[in-house]
UniProtKB/Swiss-Prot annotation:
This is Large ribosomal subunit protein uL23. GO terms for cellular component: ribonucleoprotein complex; ribosome. Pfam families: Ribosomal_L23. GO terms for molecular function: rRNA binding; structural constituent of ribosome. The keyword rRNA-binding applies.
Length: 213
């Protein structure tokens, strides 16, 4: 028999809803079906693993529709005990579960992406800081070496300029002025002495001439 012909429909009653919590489901099955066929059909359609199946025959019953009377079809009631998996009888519940699963997957993917972005940003920041530290450590050495070269080249001209400044300092100028004034005074004194000597000689010559007369 075909799998779709074996299982007709699920039986939904208060008892069946209670048994669903215990992973036991009730189905209306073709009266010609056997337990092995029912087990194969349920495992194939719902993708679950069946532990055991209990069958009960449901005979025909009288049914009145308006003025007419008739009989219902006879069938078998199958109590299916599942070992693994669950059977979603209502398609709306399946769609809801699928939507919830998709939302959870999206949330997980977004959260994972955010975490990956944060980790990548932290790693990039660490790498940049390490590169900056290496640059900062290498730059002062180069600067100090350049400074040393510059100072070694420019030391001698700086000393020469200072010597020139010392020669032209105002203190030395005043000392030079003082020496020149002293020399002038000395020359004046010598000149005065010479004039005095000439005068004395002239007076002595005059006196000698007068005595001879």
């Amino acid at each position: 028999m075909n799998h779709n012909e074996i299982i007709k429909y699920p039986l939904l009653t208060e008892k069946s809803y209670k048994t669903m919590a215990q992973n036991v489901y009730v189905f209306a099955v073709d009266r010609r079906a056997r337990k092995i066929e029912i087990k194969d059909a349920i495992e194939f359609i719902f993708e679950v693993k069946v532990e055991k199946i209990n069958l009960f025959n449901v005979p025909q019953k009288e049914k009145k529709v308006g003025r007419f009377k008739g009989l219902t079809n006879s069938y078998k009631k199958a109590y299916v005990y599942l070992r693994e998996g669950k059977i979603n009888i209502f398609p709306e519940e399946i769609e809801k579960e699928q939507k919830v699963e998709k939302q959870l997957i999206k949330e997980k993917s977004t959260s994972e992406l955010k975490l990956e972005e944060k980790i990548a940003a932290k790693i990039a920041a660490k790498e940049q800081s390490e590169i900056k530290d290496e640059i900062v450590k290498s730059v002062p050495k180069k600067v100090t070496s350049i400074k040393k070269e510059i100072t070694s080249k420019e030391v001698t001209p700086i000393k020469k300029t200072t010597s020139v400044k010392k020669e032209t300092s105002p203190k030395e100028i005043t000392s030079v002025k003082k020496t020149t004034t002293k020399e002038k005074d000395k020359t004046l004194v010598v000149a005065k002495k010479a004039t005095i000597d000439t005068k004395v000689k002239s007076t002595t010559t005059k006196k000698t001439t007068t005595k001879k007369v």
